[in-house]
Amino acid sequence: MIVEGYGKVLSRPQLDLARRELCIVAACAASRQDRQLHSHLHGALHAGASESAITETLGAISVLVSPDDAARHRMLWARVQGAADVH
């Protein structure tokens, strides 16, 4: 399952890993998958996505979700940014 369902998706050559993670961040936010969003926010950073690109991705999705969901996504992103600053 991990190799077939996850590894092959993340290793496809059409998109670089940072862009792929940004797409996954958008999908997780839009579908209210907060635990996965948390993981992929970290993943996007580790894959080389800039903080501004992640912020812009969440901003683009914010028009599609409720104000409460958008606020929750911003809080989660702020926590991830704080954790990244510690390391």
Q: For each of these PLM feature ranges, what is it?
A:
Residues A30-D34, V65-S66:
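Short alpha-helix boundary/capping elements
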